[in-house]
Amino acid sequence: MSSTVEAEEKKTEVKRGRPRTTNVLGSNTKEKVLESYRSLIKERRTADVSLDDICRRANVKKGSLLYHFGSKEGIQKIIVERYVDHLEACYQAGMQAAKEQWPDHAPAIAGFVEWFRTYSQVKDPTYSEYGLAVLSLTAGNETLIAPVNRWYESVFARIRAASEGNRKALVAVLALEGLFLLGHFRVKVLASDELNAVLDDLLVFSDKSRTA
């Protein structure tokens, strides 16, 4: 971190454990800390990283880190929120693909299918392992799990609205969540052709009778 940024941050007395509003000069420091934490998670394949490790990687002092985030949980909260933003972006991309691939199907449902189809083609193992590590942070922590819960509530609200009461759509999406979980653990139970056929079957299954 530059001496200019350090001097700017020292102008305000910092109480340990209480995050401060980030000024313009400090925004780069904040992003360096977040990126350092992300890179450490990917390398170690665990979110169990110490503040000292993060400070060394980001080349910042612990006081500066606490100035911006207040605590390690302050960093984790933003990491989880950004991961949720990533999930929403993937879902939106899936819905856009579904509009082109499956114009006669509800995008909210078909989009989930296309999202997993794209996800299943990712070869980099750190992609799914990072997601697992981030989600592991939420175990037993109501603050960290809150943005994940809110996002899933919004997803299933869209699924329910699109399916007009057809619970088969919920079953299909829950099945896809199971496939995502297997993918996170890199458990491959279906060959590519079979997987694509199953995904098509799930879409057809979810779109049949609109009765429960």
Feature locations, PLM:
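N-terminal intrinsically disordered/low-complexity leader segments
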Residues: 1-28, 211-212
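Residues at secondary-structure transition points
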Residues: 20-24, 28, 70, 74, ...
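Helix-turn-helix
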Residues: 32, 40-74, 78
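Solvent-exposed, amphipathic alpha-helical segments
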Residues: 36-43, 90-93, 97, 175-182
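Hydrophobic/aromatic residues within well-ordered alpha-helical segments
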Residues: 79, 83, 87, 105, ...
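Hydrophobic alpha-helical connector segments
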Residues: 85, 89-129
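Short alpha-helical scaffolding segments that buttress acidic/His motifs in well-ordered protein cores
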Residues: 112-116, 131-135, 172-179
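Hydrophobic/aromatic-rich alpha-helical bundle segments in the mid-to-C-terminal region
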Residues: 124, 142-212
